[in-house]
Amino acid sequence: MPFFMRKKRGEIRHMKKTAAFLVLILLAGALSACQSESGSASSDGKTVQLLNVSYDPTRELYKEYNQAFSSYWKKKTGQDVTVQQSHGGSGKQARSVIDGLDADVVTLALGYDIDSIAEKARLIDQNWQSRLPDQSTPYTSTIVFLVRKGNPKHINDWADLVKKDVSVITPNPKTSGGARWNYLAAWAYADETYHHDDTKIKQFMKDLYGNVEVLDSGARGATTSFTERGMGDVLIAWENEAYLTLKEFGKEKFEIINPSISILAEPPVSVVDKTADKKGTKKAAEAYLSYLYSKKGQEIAAKNFYRPRDKEVLKTYEKQFPKIKTVTVEKEFGGWKKAQETHFNDGGTFDSIYEK
């Protein structure tokens, strides 16, 4: 074989090796980028990144809490932890996790949304509610009204929301967990007022949603429509969101009205087991949720206007939280699975009463 042929083939073999090496480098870089984007534990164990997929109005709560947990975890383990947040309507967020969003933990508006992840994607153990105290709900809230200063439309209870001259703002129960709590609180009032008369209850709900000016996809969007876009006479809102609005905009612009009856809202939390196992973040993810029950975690919840589970912390902040008569989903609606099927699934009661 001529020398120039041997040299050419040698060059070709060298080029193939070089190309293969470059492909490996690119693959390694792509894998590294994917891990960085979704969060993971570093190979040396010195850093960990978590993704908390949460519902709409918890932004301020977890911004403060994440800083406290990072300090606690660093002191306890020597490991640096950063927590990325994703926020949106609770139902929409649950679907994102089901569709592949690599959450290490979920902190959603209601148990049904976490059950959906467990059942449809099998990413969470079925017994998730039993793993932490109070069925994995570290804080509670309820549903109230936010009106403009002076309450010009004289809104004092649910009955005032069906008056023809009242414009209501509430999110869409198809995408928002808070909206489902709002709807069920209104239904509980109608059920008590009309003595379980299903026809009258449905007419009340139809009249109420007939007054709704816009259905935003999440609670924070509804708050923005009411406070910044000037839409509506009344916002049906999470209690914590209403108080946060007063803190941000001032009591000279808005005021809170507590209805005669509301609902005990219990937003739950869970580790996304298979994702955390895959990413090597399980230990930090479990600690992240457990720390919510610590004195520090409970105080941060209370400061952000969530009702803490810890009795001592609740007593410290009791003046902040007025006593409101509430029903529970379990007793009034037979649990979230039944409530979802009856009211919010396609073809359910909400679809029949909302005609816009």
Q: What are these model-predicted stretches?
A:
Residues 276-356:
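Extracellular/periplasmic juxtamembrane helices and adjacent flexible linkers that interface
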Residues 29-33:
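C-terminal motif of bacterial Sec signal peptides marking the signal peptidase cleavage site
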Residues 57-61, 65, 93, 110-113, ...:
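Stable alpha-helical elements in mature extracytoplasmic
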Residues 6-7, 13-18:
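Positively charged n-region of N-terminal signal peptides that target proteins for export
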